[in-house]
């Protein structure tokens, strides 16, 4: 594994040293292969996480990947510039202010337009520009923030408290309505009032902060009980009915009793696992499950005794489902982890294609018929073609559909009020 890692590092160093290649702080040869043993303080030593490698897989001991699971590049100042997935595809990118270290001025996802940010002299965001979408302006006042979008809709947030205890206590919505929130001295929510003036109160445990009761606008109260591990053990409803939960000494759920008195029980074969292997409902019917070491469902047996089995690849992707009577389906994925094929036991296959942004663009049925979906830059579907017929959609800046043209050419338009 070390040899594979070193080969990859040399390849990266070569690409980074080329005139066309981006410079990166991660190209330094003086960096460790493991994290420090503890927390360290002081000047930034310039070390950054460059890649995450799979070094041991019990299920595939002789087949380790030759590329990292994730890779990161940085600016010369050590700011995160790009994130790459295990296929080598850049999935996120960042741009920073040259005069203010660490201040992000742009960000984008793979195949999506770049969002940009502007700041005031104190480092607060004053504008967010989203191509093909809504832009936002932010104005800061004494204990309030005004947010205005490019459709001129305005919201105002009023705050109380300082530092980590600052909370939004009042919100003026674009339609003129007002909602309020109240908090205790520890910053925990204790009451909310909606736009119609209806108030909901939350009673909190003094030490744990757990919600012990919720009183609605009509004065009716739901109460909650807990055990010493802060797990919910009972819920008492306004009509006096009660539901309950029981746990074992490891904190695993062993029984649930509904407000109607019906009890569902859970059993565990592995003392170290939190995943149940048996579920018995109020009628006595039992379902059984088997799990992999990674928490993946391997088999499920229903109340009738029928068993469905599941298989996974090394990345945790489901590659096969085997049902009773030999009914099986098989799935395959591309290097980015996207489903590209589903095949049944008779060999009939459905194939899938994707854009660089990860949007599903085509579905090819077993008979070769092709259905396609086209998207705009924000990932919204603008046309769907199936069987030679096309349905198209148009949107406004807020992402709301404004026109729908059906397969027969009939068109519907939609208009919205200012908010």
Residue spans for each PLM region:
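Extended charged/polar low-complexity repeat regions
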Residues: 1-419
